[in-house]
Amino acid sequence: MSRYRGPRLRITRRLGDLPGLTRKAAKRSNPPGQHGQARRKRSEYAIRLEEKQKLRFNYGISERQLVRYVKKARSLEGSTGTNLLKLLENRLDNVCFRLGFGPTIPGSRQLVNHGHVTVNGKVLDIASYQCKPGDVISIREKKGSKKLAEGNLEFPGLANVPPHLEFEKSKMSAKITGKCEREWVAIEINELLVVEYYSRKV
């Protein structure tokens, strides 16, 4: 399953607020489709599926990519759910989003893919790159790159930069000083339900 490229508000009406996907809020709280009918009680499977979809749409990844992240999270020490969130938070496109370089994760991915971002002084156009402590993430020293980021920094998608990102706004550069803690993950998600969803599938 590839990345979703349809109407984003349709997704947020169904799944709730997804700060990585869009900064717009759905005007109607009811899910898309026909209305007025009583909703059936959701099964445990449906609840787990919804949490999985939240994660996938918020970070803008395909089903295949998410499966790979789940497998990787299982191989690491500690809680699989927490490991999964940290892997997604460490993606270069997400780090750029958290710094305010892009208005959303898709917008930040576009900056990366078009060569506007450097890691440790070198242009890196791989949005899935796993950022690690010590990495320096910057906007490329080009007028066009700076102008794009400046416009986004005036109205960042999220108000607060996580404490593990040492950000110098004037230089449009940040150093990763540690790991992203669970409480700084922006999306409201029950990661344990995501792990349970994949328990018999992966």
UniProtKB/Swiss-Prot annotation:
Statement: the UniProt record of this protein carries the keyword Glycoprotein: no
Protein family per UniProt: Belongs to the universal ribosomal protein uS4 family.
Region (Disordered): 15-42
Residue span, S4 RNA-binding domain: 90-152
Subunit structure: Part of the 30S ribosomal subunit. Contacts protein S5. The interaction surface between S4 and S5 is involved in control of translational fidelity.
Intrachain disulfide bonds: none
Gene3D superfamilies recorded: Ribosomal Protein S4 Delta 41, Chain A, domain 1, RNA-binding S4 domain
InterPro entries, A to Z: Ribosomal_uS4, Ribosomal_uS4_bac-type, Ribosomal_uS4_CS, Ribosomal_uS4_N, S4_RNA-bd, S4_RNA-bd_sf
Organism name: Prochlorococcus marinus (strain MIT 9211)
Annotated protein name in UniProt: Small ribosomal subunit protein uS4
Key words, A-Z: Ribonucleoprotein, Ribosomal protein, RNA-binding, rRNA-binding
GO-annotated cellular components: small ribosomal subunit
Keyword Lipid biosynthesis included in the entry's annotation: no
GO molecular function, one term: structural constituent of ribosome
Single GO biological process annotation from the record: translation
